[in-house]
Amino acid sequence: MINKNDIVADVVTDYPKAADIFRSVGIDFCCGGQVSIEAASLEKKNVDLNELLQRLNEVEQTNTPGSLNPKFLNVSSLIQYIQSAYHEPLREEFKNLTPYVTKLSKVHGPNHPYLVELKETYDTFKNGMLEHMQKEDDVDFPKLIKYEQGEVVDDINTVIDDLVSDHIATGQLLVKMSELTSSYEPPIEACGTWRLVYQRLKALEVLTHEHVHLENHVLFKKVS
């Protein structure tokens, strides 16, 4: 049974669908997930701890036996999973979404300056993530695999610390985009492109939170 003293990130690791519940009440299970459920709930207004625990335990009870839980994968298999489930889809989404973000800023930015700032923040986020993922694929992940295989990797802790620092910076950019868009709620007058951009940015946020959680709280723990 999940209780108030359980660590938020650990709950999501054990029961991935719990991420949806934490997300719905604004609790960070990603870079800020190393706190108890009770402590996290106290930081949020209008979060009833007992109700939250009830919802989480419903997820625990309905957890499907035999369904893939990445925490049971070894390092090399987990890396392959991360690359196929997150790196490849993120690259594709950046390629497809960027023209819409640019169009939104160009067409509506003159009357809504925050959309210009949104594009600038998105570009920083996108470029940072693309560089980060490429470095992981080319340099960092091979080091983690070597470490798993018993080879000496002198800078393994530095590798992990640097990646976590990148993730924190990524999280800050996601917060800024959410704030600029009022949690991705388009105004009444928003056109189709506007609504499309907000919808897909929100989905991008969800995907990135899951991605970072899996690396910070599952992958890196296997090699630290």
UniProtKB/Swiss-Prot annotation:
A Pfam match: Hemerythrin
Cellular component, GO annotation: cytoplasm
SUPFAM superfamilies recorded: SP0561-like
InterPro entries the record matches: Hemerythrin-like, RIC_family, ScdA, ScdA-like_N_sf
Signal is among the record's keywords: no
Subunit structure of this chain's protein: Homodimer.
Identification of the protein by name: Iron-sulfur cluster repair protein ScdA
Source species of the chain: Staphylococcus aureus (strain MRSA252)
Gene expressing this chain: scdA
